Amino acid sequence: MYHHSPFYPHHLQTGEQDLDMERENDMDQNSKNSTQKPVKREKRRYRCRKRSPATIERAKTVRRDKANARERRRMNSLNDALEHLRGILPALPDEPKMTKIETLRKAQEYIASLSFQLSGGSPDSSQCCETGSCGLCSASQSLQSTPFQSPCFPQPLQYPSSYSNPPSQMYYHHHHQSPSFPHH
């Protein structure tokens, strides 16, 4: 496409010729590469105003403060949940506050013991704990001071006051027989 006009500047005519040739080459390549994915154009990077070091530091501080606040809320939520769990688990009145890992392990044992109780199973304590057949007894070796060490022995949360059992029998040591509960 040539423009020979006295009103059309010469330097634009050659530039337009170059553009026309590029377009033709592009069309030829597109027809040859029609099976290939189209080439993505790079995004333009616009220059943005440079921020001062003080502004950058303030932005970093704000981001860090927000992250710290999120982490603090997460930890408070976790601690509240663990405190609630400690309140549900049976414990001796003079027992010191359990650590997080002790609380989780004891909860695991307590759930397993309640499951055994619901299923009507009452495995022999020595057999279970010697063979480790329940899978949890071996995990409880670090918790020998807790009211129950094996899921083989369910622990009640509380006996109703109508029962004649003294409070000292509410908790059982590792190899004692599990109580039988009355059926309602």
From Swiss-Prot:
Subcellular location: Nucleus
Region feature Helix-loop-helix motif, mapped onto this chain: 76-114
Residue ranges of the region described as Disordered: 1-55, 164-184
Entry-linked Gene3D superfamilies: Helix-loop-helix DNA-binding domain (4.10.280.10)
Basic residues bias spans: 38-52, 172-184
InterPro entries per UniProt: bHLH_dom (IPR011598), bHLH_transcription_factors (IPR050359), HLH_DNA-bd_sf (IPR036638)
A GO term from the CC aspect: nucleus
Renumbered residue ranges of the record's region Basic motif: 62-75
Protein function: Acts as a transcriptional regulator. Regulates expression of various genes, including homeobox protein unc-42 and helix-loop-helix protein hlh-34. Required for embryonic viability, neuromuscular development, organization of the nerve ring and neuronal cell body location. Regulates AIY neuron axon morphology and cell fate. Plays a role in cell autonomously establishing a neuronal left-right asymmetry. Involved in regulating glial specification.
Subunit comment: Interacts with hlh-2; the interaction is direct.
Full protein name: Helix-loop-helix protein ngn-1
Organism expressing this protein natively: Caenorhabditis elegans
Highest classification ranks of the organism: Eukaryota, Metazoa, Ecdysozoa, Nematoda, Chromadorea
